Amino acid sequence: MGPAPAGEQLRGATGEPEVMEPALEGTGKEGKKASSRKRTLAEPPAKGLLQPVKLSRAELYKEPTNEELNRLRETEILFHSSLLRLQVEELLKEVRLSEKKKDRIDAFLREVNQRVVRVPSVPETELTDQAWLPAGVRVPLHQVPYAVKGCFRFLPPAQVTVVGSYLLGTCIRPDINVDVALTMPREILQDKDGLNQRYFRKRALYLAHLAHHLAQDPLFGSVCFSYTNGCHLKPSLLLRPRGKDERLVTVRLHPCPPPDFFRPCRLLPTKNNVRSAWYRGQSPAGDGSPEPPTPRYNTWVLQDTVLESHLQLLSTILSSAQGLKDGVALLKVWLRQRELDKGQGGFTGFLVSMLVVFLVSTRKIHTTMSGYQVLRSVLQFLATTDLTVNGISLCLSSDPSLPALADFHQAFSVVFLDSSGHLNLCADVTASTYHQVQHEARLSMMLLDSRADDGFHLLLMTPKPMIRAFDHVLHLRPLSRLQAACHRLKLWPELQDNGGDYVSAALGPLTTLLEQGLGARLNLLAHSRPPVPEWDISQDPPKHKDSGTLTLGLLLRPEGLTSVLELGPEADQPEAAKFRQFWGSRSELRRFQDGAIREAVVWEAASMSQKRLIPHQVVTHLLALHADIPETCVHYVGGPLDALIQGLKETSSTGEEALVAAVRCYDDLSRLLWGLEGLPLTVSAVQGAHPVLRYTEVFPPTPVRPAFSFYETLRERSSLLPRLDKPCPAYVEPMTVVCHLEGSGQWPQDAEAVQRVRAAFQLRLAELLTQQHGLQCRATATHTDVLKDGFVFRIRVAYQREPQILKEVQSPEGMISLRDTAASLRLERDTRQLPLLTSALHGLQQQHPAFSGVARLAKRWVRAQLLGEGFADESLDLVAAALFLHPEPFTPPSSPQVGFLRFLFLVSTFDWKNNPLFVNLNNELTVEEQVEIRSGFLAARAQLPVMVIVTPQDRKNSVWTQDGPSAQILQQLVVLAAEALPMLEKQLMDPRGPGDIRTVFRPPLDIYDVLIRLSPRHIPRHRQAVDSPAASFCRGLLSQPGPSSLMPVLGYDPPQLYLTQLREAFGDLALFFYDQHGGEVIGVLWKPTSFQPQPFKASSTKGRMVMSRGGELVMVPNVEAILEDFAVLGEGLVQTVEARSERWTV
């Protein structure tokens, strides 16, 4: 595939986007006004095709210079293509700081330094005596318990040092943060400050005093507090310049102790530095018991002692190797696009920088490598190395006094030691986050190894927000409920270690609990904790419950997702007690067919949509049982969109069962056709050619049982007819089946004669099905309708050579040549290509059970926007199929919800002008063939449709988009998808609930010039509307199943018939838009040329009136008469015709 760079965003930690240059006009821009939407539909497409560069012969054959030869050699060695090199260089140019901005930042840093060292000192007081603090500033730390020993005085910092990525040249836009370490004078600190948060209290008081004085300085436009990497014990002070440079940079001040002040041996992961008697007012478990270790607390102290040494290490390795710096910058972009560096416990840019240093030290990366090679090497390492099992270390020392890796593994989920051997750099990274990093690295390596043309774009330019990357998400709120979870899970040591942060304390145990419970249903569980927002220095720091929402993402495994049974051990095994303890009251003894008696859990789920939501039952049950988190605190987002494709009667089903029943009935009919006796030629193939038979019909049919009293009966044809005094009967669409007959010399060679023979076969087919199987049939010259088990099938007899016969053209000299005609192309599409497509998509559904739901939601949305008739049904099915066959950079969707979001993203960002959409069914197209097809596409672009979809069976012509959409309709769809996607994602990620999920399905009616409102009485699919009516009309169907001997009314849809008449009569003046699924409104847009005066012609006065302008007779639309004709044509169906005259003038 080849998505356009349009609408893509590189998001920083604060979520502010830096929009890359758009390539497709009008894409991804929110807040489009109605007038712009109207222009989109009405105006011709903008010129935007990529044109080949033409060179003169001399330029084409000019010898390369030495510089060009060197560059080519470098490209061959360091990159796998020159295109990739250009893309990498352009991206780095985009995210790097310019020299001008660096100079302005340097100047600001010098000003900050001068002001910090001039802050006045404060005399010594007790730590608990904070009366000296001015009224306008609050201590940025929760002082619980408040009582703590020690004294504090303020002295200006002994040293001010810039640390972090700014000096290294690896920081990336748009959010430039410069970290500054303030070394506190030794006189402020005391020997036992490592105990009971004393150091952290002093650190916070130091910042509070600084904040008070710096806030009064006119240099700063903003002075506020923030948490360092989300750690609530380690606030930092943020400074931003005043005026035009306000967004240029954020300087973060980090107080730290003097070098070697804290002894590392006291801060080992096995040591305790928060006494239970101080923190809880009691010893841990009675007299004489050991204090629990506080590894995370110890790590947070240690982190402040190594800021400068880490900078020196990074500088030594990176400073002389531009390729390493480029690699770090690319890795930071990679993390940012996947939101892996956000919030507490994120996999930060600092960690990947240190990982590069580790790989250099172990000779897995060489300093001469390019940024792309560094990126590949790091991703390869992450994909194949599990730091939760085998930690790594930068420490080269063999000192026996150093702690062992095993000690760190016992204390932390992920282990990566720094060069001192005392500090775990990944102390804050949870196992879930690291496994997510591993998962993303594996996907990225597969993408890079495929060498796809758009691999760079998918890897580094495509955002992967949680709601679009995971099948289901769940929000836990309020966070204060996690306090109860800590009590239930007995997490007192963890609370003590985390300084009371019950969210961090409970996070690991909760994710482990859910991973165990979801088992084979789960591929990956990830969590997202949004960064705690900054706060004003005059405010108290945010409480733990105010730190946003804890959101968990579930990447599901389709193989085990829909199983209703959790099978436990046999009753007499010792593991049975553990199983019962884990599942609680849901576990029960069951006897199975093999005679075994086992513990088991059975979940309640009747329909496929309910089975997809079994993880919801698992999550809520386990959280309530083990963590005391009630269901009311768990907002699970897995199926809110299911309501849009739910059947009319089975409100709990999204139609999969009805589709399976229809396909099963089709299979039975196929067997009957294969076994028919008495046909002059045998059946060679029976193929489905209808959306139902590829599982993509939005509202699948159900068996029809007509109430005969509701209809008129046509006895001689055993058929029913609608009655004028009754509401419109239920809509019944026959399912097309193509029946191929064997070739024979008896077939005529004349096209008209072939059609007559086919008509005879249609009649004979009906006779034999009625005689041999008692089926109700109705034959015509082109098809035979068959009623079987309440379903209606339309069988079309096909002869394989007929398309070729239709292509034959005879010259006056008697020479026969083959030439495509409209009739031959249509017949080939309907009898060969459509059955092949239906068969391929049927197979895709067997492979990916979510395909049906995704395709149906996609079509439901397109039709709800009143644009359905601009797109062939098959074209939308293929776009949905592309999400499963080419899911990069994601995995194939396992839920309709995430698939629909990706559909909106694909539609709104794909570069339809310059790329064909590849849908490689059955993986038949090789990479070389795709390159060849792309070249042919660019060469013939002007002759191809605006939307080109390539499949293995349709490599050049894009059969399914030949008749639409137009450029204007496609652009309107792109605009609507770009507006709907962020709105829907915001709704689904709202922890209070998604609100009205149907909002994005409601069409924007304000863009239309005329609205024709229809009577629900004559809308047969009224109940399928986006806003389903509370009550509708009886449609003449019996609720109880039973045999039917009469053919129901087929394909009778008055709004569609009315639309056909409108287009025939007024298609030259206006465009008509309608939602076939129960829409009550037809939108009318006048064409731009409609109101231009036309020369008077007696032959074209329809809908126009004659006027005199400039002495000449001209014709202009007679709007009043046209609107009256709208109502007359639709008499009985049309309720009102609303002319929105403010939108147009004659």
UniProtKB/Swiss-Prot annotation:
One of its GO terms (biological process) is tRNA export from nucleus. The keyword Mitochondrion does not apply. One of its GO terms (molecular function) is RNA binding. Keywords: Chromosome, Coiled coil, Nucleus, Phosphoprotein, RNA-binding. It holds the Pfam family Nrap_D5. One of its GO terms (cellular component) is small-subunit processome. Signal peptide: none annotated. InterPro entries: NOL6/Upt22, Nrap_D1, Nrap_D2, Nrap_D3, Nrap_D4, Nrap_D5, Nrap_D6. The modification Phosphoserine is found at S56, S283, S289, S811. Belongs to the NRAP family. Part of the small subunit (SSU) processome, first precursor of the small eukaryotic ribosomal subunit. During the assembly of the SSU processome in the nucleolus, many ribosome biogenesis factors, an RNA chaperone and ribosomal proteins associate with the nascent pre-rRNA and work in concert to generate RNA folding, modifications, rearrangements and cleavage as well as targeted degradation of pre-ribosomal RNA by the RNA exosome. Part of the small subunit (SSU) processome, composed of more than 70 proteins and the RNA chaperone small nucleolar RNA (snoRNA) U3. Interacts with RRP7A; required for NOL6 localization to nucleolus. This is Nucleolar protein 6. It comes from Homo sapiens. The gene is NOL6.
